[in-house]
């Protein structure tokens, strides 16, 4: 199914097509990896809504990305509960370990580091979201283990891609 068909199918579930902007953005981001201007315009055109409505949602919610992000998007909560449990020190640790600052992506494109206002998981503070998964009760050692597991997954994926490459 094409992106247009998926968006049309999602929009059919709503009485007002404006209500379908969020699911349409999710579909478009899954297809393109992020939501640059032309993709936002395409979503608005498919839904028949004002571009500003699409742009407002795409730039308000932290789950949408208008710029490319790394294969692993590390979103560290920096709200009160997580701060009280050490998220500031964990942010510094991640910046030092990865050699990037908040808002940046590693040169190899593997990791993007962000902070988010609240992940709604205060019971396991400090917490970080990576993709759809939450990782809680974090400390520097757990972060290092997580980063290594992500790097190991990257190595496996790279080997699989190389093995699947035609003519090699």
Swiss-Prot record:
Record EC number: 7.1.1.-
Required co-factors: [2Fe-2S] cluster
GO molecular function: 2 iron, 2 sulfur cluster binding; metal ion binding; NADH dehydrogenase activity; quinone binding
SUPFAM superfamilies membership: Thioredoxin-like
Free-text comment on the cofactor: Binds 1 [2Fe-2S] cluster.
Cystine bridges: none
Annotated positions binding [2Fe-2S] cluster: 77, 82, 118, 122
The family this protein is said to belong to: Belongs to the complex I 24 kDa subunit family.
Name this protein carries in UniProt: NADH-quinone oxidoreductase subunit E 2
Organism in which the protein naturally occurs: Rhizobium meliloti (strain 1021) (Ensifer meliloti)
Lineage, top ranks: Bacteria, Pseudomonadati, Pseudomonadota, Alphaproteobacteria, Hyphomicrobiales
Name of the gene this protein is made from: nuoE2
